[in-house]
A protein has these predicted regions:
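Cys/His-rich microdomains that often coordinate metals
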Residues: 36, 54-55, 92
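Short linker/helix segments within small regulatory modules
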Residues: 37-46
Length: 163
């Protein structure tokens, strides 16, 4: 991931204040444990600021940020979920694990359907969890319901770029 040459404004305490160009996701490096702030970006793959290891790419998106997040150059899994959904809670750690396992090849975008109804409608998420697999901006697969890890990994495997 390339560094942003614009450092942004300073806060009164001397640190950087939040930038107006989008929310920040915090990704924890599995290699060294460093917390990394990642902004929505259609280019590149996030790398740890400390050890430069490829980071697992799991972010939360909204109606406003989704298109930038989904424009990634890797396979994207859109997880349409809700806080009250028990099967969604079953799938969440599996997706986190797959994002770690396929760091640099897979981006998981979590969308809370209650907070982002336009995206739920756009992807026709009539049942949740609904997973939408995207490649190069287009939908290549849809998975409705909770699958165990082996079956979910098998469904995603053909859509992942080669190592």
């Amino acid at each position: 991931m390339t560094a942003d040459p614009s450092p942004g404004p300073r806060s009164p305490r001397g640190g950087r204040s939040p930038r107006p160009d989008g929310p920040v996701s915090i990704l924890i490096c599995p290699a060294c444990g460093t917390k990394n702030r990642i902004r929505p970006s259609p280019r590149g793959v996030p790398a740890c600021a400390n050890c430069k290891a490829t980071l697992p790419w799991l972010v939360h998106a909204t109606d406003a940020t989704f298109d930038v997040e989904a424009a990634a150059q890797v396979s994207v899994v859109v997880d349409l979920w809700a806080t009250w959904c028990a099967p969604c809670r079953f799938v969440a750690p599996i997706l986190e694990d797959l994002a770690r396992e396929h760091a640099g090849r897979l981006k998981v975008i979590k969308v809370d359907v209650d907070a982002n109804p336009a995206l739920a409608q756009r992807f026709q998420a009539f049942s949740i969890p609904t997973l939408v697999v995207m490649r190069d901006g287009g939908v290549v697969d849809r998975i409705v319901g909770a699958l165990p890890r082996p079956q979910l990994a098998a469904r995603l495997a053909p859509h992942l770029p080669p190592h």
